[in-house]
Amino acid sequence: IPSWYWEGDAVDVETAFSNSGRGRVPYFDILTRSLILSGSKPSYRQVLFGSYKNKYPDHYEMGFMLTRHIKSQYNVNSINEILTKTLKWPFLLNPLAPFSRSVYKTLNSNISDIYSDALYDKRALWEKLVIEIEEDSVTNISPNQENWTDYKFPSPSINGSLIALKSGVATLPTIVRVKDGIEEKIHELSSSIEIFGFHSNGRQVVWSYYSPDKRWSKESWANIQILDLSTNQIKDISTKKMYYHPSLSKNGNYIVASSFSKERNSLLTIIDARTGKVNDRVLPPDNGIIMEPSWSDDAKDIVFILQNDQGRSMYIYNRLKRTFLKIKDSSWEDIFRPVFYNNYVLFESPYKGIDNILAINLEDSQEYLLTNRKLGAYYPALKDSTTLLFSNYTSNGEQIVSKKINTDKWKPISKVRFDPVRFYQPPYHELNLNDNYEEQPDKKYNVENYSHFSNFFNIHSRYIFNDMFDPSFGIQSDNILGTASLSADISYNQKEDVFKKRIGLSYLKYYPIVNFDL
């Protein structure tokens, strides 16, 4: 069974039964949109197996498109029927391709044709929508590339150059300096950087990176490093911390980041960029999770996104007064990456199904549309007081562009926005799922101290290896905390006509692992 089946169905279910599933986020299927709007027609097998040259949708994105198409065009129960037929005597009915056979038996169509139909429907939908979009005028800055290349997190630097994070199909995230269409490689980073956070103030670069513990596999950290662009020296700011989305102040004195306590509370944390000392740490309002904090030019205010069970909102924190001000109410709008601009805050947000750069007026809360792109605009930054930088999504990756800012030409938009593509009626209304839910009584569980020694053994499995020359039978024990593991088996060597007994014990509670085999 291909992985797109499981993951696509999972995405579809979370999208249908939540307000913030991945299927409602424009960036989730943007690669598929970029391919179909550019006229590209990759086959099912090309997308299924991927490429080292071209970038294709992963199994999440392709799976969501296929499973949603099957449920909408055939029957919501078709997905379950395909699975049932696949797992029922697969080696007798079709030992080579049980899944493909089940798809054809259930839908009377093969999977390649279903993929082509889904792609055709998606193309027809988006071509109709984007034909009405008149894209705004922008100036290309990043170098043209033959293969798929992304330039993210653009920020102005010295002598008219830009700092950005470059990545591609065969390229690790790399800090580059771009000027006059020519790029200079500065430093390669790990692939976790794009998720954990990256920012530059033009003279320095800061990022958060994944740092696993050398011994405890379930313990890991997100630490901060800072790079001085004038010397190319890297400095560790933290060790064994959990810092995400770090941002440097313009003067380079402070770093603000989202951190987490051991109680899993999200904290707005201000750090001295030279010493790594924490200057301030504060809980946000409404028990939310802090995302993408960003400094004002004078380093007095910090704007950030807050996410909780009511959706996402936007706040400003005053560093000197230690006060919060809500500037955008909670909603399920997928807002992201706020930055200050005069008396406005610029941010990413979906508008009619496409991510664009918006602005909110800090005086009257009126919102404006700054960009109008057919695929998406991301990573807003200010080159100067009259020029906006952002990453423009194209059929060949995210490219850095600039656009002149003229507040007189900004288009006011409603705070309540309807997405004609993603605010759909899911097909699950046919199943009357609410009728199947039963009220579950409250149950109290006894809380007791865990005894490590009385729970040392926990036999949970037995196994038989029916090897022709060396059949064996054994048992496996692992305690609940995973600190003790026992395996024991007996096997018979037919050639030598002898039984072989083996027992193995591993004790993992302390730093050195103790192994015993007999």
What are these regions (language model features)?
Residues 23, 27, 147-148, 166-175, ...:
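A flexible loop/linker signature enriched in serine peptidases of the S9 family
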Residues 54-57, 81-197, 202, 229, ...:
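Beta/coil-rich, acidic/histidine-enriched accessory regions frequently appended to metallopeptidases
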Residues 138-145, 182-188, 233-238, 277-284, ...:
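A short beta-strand motif characteristic of beta-propeller blades
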Residues 1-73, 80, 84-126, 136:
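Acidic/His/Gly-enriched intrinsically disordered linker/tail segments
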